[in-house]
């Protein structure tokens, strides 16, 4: 029986969620390729999308523009769909330095990477789920458009085992080695197997605590059990088990032979070209590197950086579209692009950045030209591979609006909170005027955000406010993660009342205590004063019932006009709904920790901040680092990726300052 998507939640759709859900579902069922959901901040967009997935019952790829956001969405969707396969697919590098060459200084930078084993397991879990069931939601970062091995090979090389099946034990061991499993009778971990007489234990790449025990009787599989890899406790009896490859870049032996021949052929052509052009150093370099890789591939079926030969391994012609996660989905699937105003431009930019770096490596003999085909999709290729897409954003970009002129709106917040009213005031005397407003807010125990255009103005304003006795702090791009956490928490706790910054659009600044957002130089057109940036900045005051925005400007620009009109329009819709349903807006009451846990490191990090790294003794620093590393691994294991990512950043800073 097919499994169905099923939401488990105490809430039912409210406000304009039911209409948005109905329209999106109608669009998908009628075959619309692209739709836009314009959801204001705090209106429950994830819940709406969850209901759409439940209604249309299609495997879904949710794309986010960074790992932190992907982690948040993954946690939310896992809560809504506890009985379905909600998977997580992001780059598995904790640290990644791609190989690169700087011709000016003749510096070659080797690829250096630290792979997060937990995330690698989740990636394997995601791809294997797509082949085993239909009720799959994969939350991915934009890096999912990077090349992956062939889904056909991945599927065909699955080792399928059943009770009663005739199978020679040694034949099974050979098959496991062919799909990149290594024999290890001592250090038993993911991607390995061990043998004890007639018993073979396999640790699948997609699991982290359970392994599969295969018991043979002669040449027949007598029993299959799922056991705890650490304690050996039997968890379940199985009739059938599918062991998926331990790498996404797996290739059959006969294909590998053809690939090696083709790589050798390309190498000969490239050597001739380089020698004819007098590039002897480059020729020697490419020959040495490629021959070493070929030797490894012959002996082990694998080599470091094998993805650079992916075109040959999948027997694709030059310039052909690479396989990616999108190819692992069935044809009829749904894509949700979260924060599409950021994620769509990211997809566009990825290909060009990748090609520029690789071309230098090819020109200087570090890689064969075929390495250029190990790449992310171009935007056109991405478009071709998509089936049906929902773009989700509070401020959809021009591309999305062009693709789907009819926008589905979600404006009403379940809390009844309104978009803030906006005042426009002249620049002359703005600081004195602002000072009066700040003092009003302080008297009510509320907070203020001020956004300026330049670093100098931020610094001068902060100094001035300090001089007149206001408790103020300044947030700029050079503030490290560690300090940023403290600053946001201290603002919420009331250790200071005003936060000044240039770009206040970053995650983590949705603070319910903020009742005033002041935008200085609102009439200076540019990235930070575009209509989208202004709408996003105005949204920072939408978490408080007394929220208000003041724009200081001598003229009204087109961007200001659009942002003000849009905010007024949303506010009038919200007011009408509240009046009709007798709702009184109430400021969100959130413990300081709630907000911070989702966006920055949690309160516990206070212990790490007590002594600045520079003042710690070597022993204290080592102890703190060890403690944080253990906590980071625990957080990743508990799927609290925001916390793990934050701890990783803190660790990097601590090590750098040591």
Swiss-Prot record:
CDD domains: DEXHc_UvrB, SF2_C_UvrB. Its main location: cytoplasm. Residues 26-413 form the Helicase ATP-binding domain. The UvrABC repair system catalyzes the recognition and processing of DNA lesions. A damage recognition complex composed of 2 UvrA and 2 UvrB subunits scans DNA for abnormalities. Upon binding of the UvrA(2)B(2) complex to a putative damaged site, the DNA wraps around one UvrB monomer. DNA wrap is dependent on ATP binding by UvrB and probably causes local melting of the DNA helix, facilitating insertion of UvrB beta-hairpin between the DNA strands. Then UvrB probes one DNA strand for the presence of a lesion. ATP binds at residues 39-46. PROSITE patterns: HELICASE_ATP_BIND_1, HELICASE_CTER, UVR. A motif (Beta-hairpin) lies at residues 92-115. Residues 622-657 form the UVR domain. One of its GO terms (molecular function) is ATP binding. Forms a heterotetramer with UvrA during the search for lesions. Interacts with UvrC in an incision complex. Pfam families: Helicase_C (PF00271), ResIII (PF04851), UVR (PF02151), UvrB (PF12344), UvrB_inter (PF17757). GO terms for cellular component: cytoplasm; excinuclease repair complex. Gene3D superfamilies: 6.10.140.240, P-loop containing nucleotide triphosphate hydrolases, UVR domain. This is UvrABC system protein B. One of its GO terms (biological process) is nucleotide-excision repair. The beta-hairpin motif is involved in DNA binding. It comes from the Bacteria. InterPro entries: Helicase/UvrB_N, Helicase_ATP-bd, Helicase_C-like, P-loop_NTPase, UVR_dom, UVR_dom_sf, UvrB, UvrB_inter. Residues 430-596 form the Helicase C-terminal domain. Belongs to the UvrB family.
